[in-house]
Structure formats: C-alpha cells, structure tokens
Amino acid sequence: MLQERKLILITRKTRLQELKEKYCTLGQAKFYIEHLGERFDNYVAEDALYVEAQKTVLTHLKESGRVQLLERSMLSTYLFANDDIIVVLGQDGLVANTLKYLKGQPLIAINPIPDLYDGVLLPFCVSDTLEALNNVLRSRMSVKRISMAQVTTNLGDSMLAVNDVFIGPKTHTSARYKICVGEATEQQSSSGVIVSTGLGSTGWFKSILAGASGIAQRPLHKQLSNGFAWDSADLYYSVREP
C-alpha cells in the first residue's frame, strides 16, 4: 500500500567497492588484500551479501511508497524532512553516523548480514523490513530513544555526538585542561578527554573502564559495568591517557 511519507534508505559502500575505487581494478585490489595475508574471497562474499540485502530492502520499501537511496558520504549535505522515515542498512557505525543528522524522525536499523555483523544497534533483519515499516506507519512501533551530546567551541561552531566526543590535540600529544561542569572544576594533563553518552557507554567508554580497572586492580563500578541508559541525560568524562 503506497503512502505519502518519503522513505530514505541509507547505505554505505562495501569494503570491496571501496577497494575498487581506490585501486581501479579488482585485480589490483585482490593483489593488495592478499599481500596483507587476507582472503580476498571474504571481501567478495561480503559484497555479494550486502548488495543482495540492499536489493531486497529496496524492493520492500518501493511497495510502500517513494524511496530515496542515500549513500553515507552524502549524509552531511542532505536535508531530511520532518516526516521522513529513515531506514539504515547497517553496521552500527552507519546507524550512529545517521542519527546525528536527524531531528526526531523514526529510524529503522537493519542488519544486512547477521552472521557477519554484531548489530548492537541493529534490531531488525532484512525479512523484518515490511513489518517494521508498517508498525512505524501505524504508530505501533516500540521506540528506543537516545540522548546526544552537543558540543560548542569558543568560535561558535557546534556539533552533535551520538556516542562520544574526543577533546584533545589531533596529534594526541599531552595537553593541559581545565574542566568545568556546573560549579565543579578540575585541572588535568592528558592526551585527551572522552565524553560519552548512554549510547556510547557500551563501546569506547566500556573499554576505557576495563583498562582503568586493570591498571587500578579494582572491579568496575556495578552501575557502569553494563553501560547506562541510551536516553540518559548524563555524560561521563574519561581521561584517554593518564
């Protein structure tokens, strides 16, 4: 059944497609991969599975309405309408990257290759596409909301972060910081500070805590061992390198 809301399918180039663009021919790409000691047929198989998943999802979406196919590199320049429905053919990184350009539009995250990708942010398979879309259209969907961090520099530039914000020199050399949160102030010196959201709390933040726990020989805080809520208003600050 056709409906008026536009369906935006977000995709990304496969590793094989990126290699073909970089080295111009499959032969050159194969030589490079095998020179690294990797199996080139893994790249070919992954590409075939992703392309097939994209065709299937696109077919399902076209049965329901107008579809706009959008590659990841175009995200920063695309203007989403308020009533657009976003469908991401993941990995997790593509979902996170897409979220920061949205303003409350529903996002359906699909895992194109469940046997290959660990989809923490990908609750749906390709076969779930129509059911998930129909639930959104009928407002019957189960929604998981997230909170993002907004960063503003002293020059007035602003950006949104879905997982983490890294504050520090590009060279990762040590620098001094004065951190002020409310009335609390702390002076420190490190190669950077990581500010994590709830969505990022099971990724980089968790690795940081595990490393700190190993160095200090102390167990992780129980409240943070499994991360914190995706929609939490809290932000956690971590020193990248003491």
Predicted regions and their residues:
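Catalytic phosphate-donor-binding core of small-molecule kinases
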Residues: L2-L7, T11-K13, E18, K30, ...
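A short, basic/flexible loop-to-alpha-helix module at the beginning of a structural domain
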Residues: R72-F80
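Structural motif
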Residues: D84-I85
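N-terminal glycine-rich "phosphate-gripper" loop used for MgATP/nucleotide binding
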Residues: V88-D92
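Short, acidic/turn-prone active-site loops that include or flank metal/cofactor-
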Residues: G93, P112-D115
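Short glycine/serine/threonine-rich phosphate/pyrophosphate-binding segments
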Residues: L94-L99, T202-F205
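A short, gly/pro- and small-residue-rich
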Residues: T98-P112
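Conserved binding/recognition cores within well-folded domains
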Residues: L199
